[in-house]
A protein has these predicted regions:
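Bacterial N-terminal signal peptides that target proteins for export
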Residues: 7-32
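C-terminal functional modules
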Residues: 309-363
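N-terminal signal peptide c-region/cleavage motif recognized by signal peptidases
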Residues: 40-41
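Acidic, polar ligand-binding/catalytic clefts
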Residues: 88, 92, 96, 100-165, ...
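Bilobed "Venus flytrap"/periplasmic-binding protein-like clamshell domains
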Residues: 60-69, 79-94, 128, 148-204
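Extended ligand-binding regions for polar small-molecule ligands
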Residues: 85-88, 92-94, 157-160, 164, ...
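Extracytoplasmic small-molecule ligand-binding "clamshell" domains
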Residues: 46-124, 310, 315, 323, ...
């Protein structure tokens, strides 16, 4: 091989190497630019919800259309329930007043569109946390406020004592819910040939059971207790079957892209749960501000300012508990022993009492 041939080959290899390095540099610059654009978009959106709530002076909270124990208005139009109290706690933490709130009743078909469009700031409406909803709708599930499962309500006159006896039965169910899909899966798994009778609203579905249109009605077990005790013509004529056919972790939902607001909603729920573990109640929280317990001092903002990490002031957690009480109080008042539903705590007990409620440390 001549010197000229060697040089030619070397020059060609060198050119290819230089070109490769140039392409790598260009790709790297594009990646950096894309990352910068993403970060700038996130930063531009960060805090948008909190700013809007503060400017408006009102929290817009999406709730159910009338589920006793969770979200329902009384005859004077005042809302109450576990989901409602979560929103009141958020309003207290953010705006300093649990009454600075507008409740927006939404059915299952309306709820996600209302959140996506910005009609509401937070959705607190017995909504199950699933992979599909979490990954594809552009939402964050902030926390779990109630561990539930799907069950069945039947009229005792049908002599049904197990869900597996519902072969060929007409079962009332609400459209656009995980309940509808779970019913189909349960029917196929056990070869029951269940005939779903689908309704657009919660109310229409359970009323069809009472009118005799269906042999059973299915929804979350907590909802069944609500319907049986509050809506049935005679509660003693109806039975909640023992089987739960799904896991239904319920909790508040926010839009993706606003990490600050996501953190505020999440940590407000954790504050209610942590308050119960610390023994802080709605009645005792004022006196507790003079406590020498470091955990209590930190929680109430006496010794540390955790609120600045959330864009709030140091008394945010104090106000949330003062407004609605701790998680145990919220539970018992709305769905537990002090309510019409009389539901047991079950999985909704604190972690150190055999339940699943476990708040990360507020510190």
């Amino acid at each position: 091989m001549s010197c000229s041939e060697v040089f030619s080959r070397y020059a060609g290899a060198s050119s290819i190497h230089s070109l490769s390095r140039l392409m790598i540099r260009r790709l790297a610059l594009r990646a950096v630019a894309a990352t910068a654009l993403t970060l700038s978009a996130q930063l531009a959106h960060a805090g948008k919800t909190l700013d809007g709530v503060k400017q408006r002076g009102v929290l817009q909270c999406g709730v159910g259309t009338g589920v006793a124990g969770f979200s329902a208005p009384d005859n004077k139009g005042r809302w109450s329930g576990l989901d409602v109290d979560v929103c009141r706690a958020i309003a207290a933490a953010v705006l300093g007043d649990p009454e600075k709130i507008r409740f927006v009743p939404l059915n299952a078909q309306q709820r996600f569109a209302a959140l996506q469009s910005g009609q509401i700031d937070v959705l607190s409406r017995n909504t199950s946390w699933t992979l599909t909803r979490d990954a594809s709708l552009g939402f964050h599930f902030a926390a779990i406020t109630y561990y539930d499962g799907q069950g069945f309500l039947v009229a005792k006159k049908y002599k049904v004592t197990s869900a597996k006896q519902l072969k060929g039965a007409q079962v009332c169910v609400q459209a656009g819910t995980t309940t509808e899909k779970n019913l189909s899966d349960f029917s196929r798994t056990h070869n029951l040939g269940i005939k779903p009778v689908v309704f657009d609203t919660f109310e229409a579905a359970f009323k069809a059971l009472f009118s005799g249109r269906c042999q059973a009605y299915t929804t979350d077990a907590s909802g069944l207790a609500s319907v049986r005790n509050k809506e049935a013509p005679n509660p003693e004529d109806y039975l909640i079957l023992p089987e739960l056919i799904s896991k239904e972790p319920l909790g508040p939902v926010v839009r993706r892209g606003d990490d600050e607001w996501f953190a505020i909603v999440k940590w407000t729920v954790f504050a209610l749960q942590e308050a119960e573990e610390l023994g802080l109640t709605q009645a005792s929280v004022d006196q507790a501000r003079s406590s020498t317990d470091p955990s209590v001092q930190r929680f109430l903002g006496v010794s540390e300012d955790t609120g600045k990490l959330l864009g709030l002031d140091k008394a945010w957690a104090y106000r949330a508990v003062k407004a609605v009480g701790n998680y145990g109080e919220v539970f018992e008042r709305n769905v537990g022993a002090k309510s019409l539903l009389k539901l047991p705590r079950g999985l909704n007990k604190q972690w150190n009492q055999g339940g699943l409620v476990y708040a990360p440390p507020i510190r």
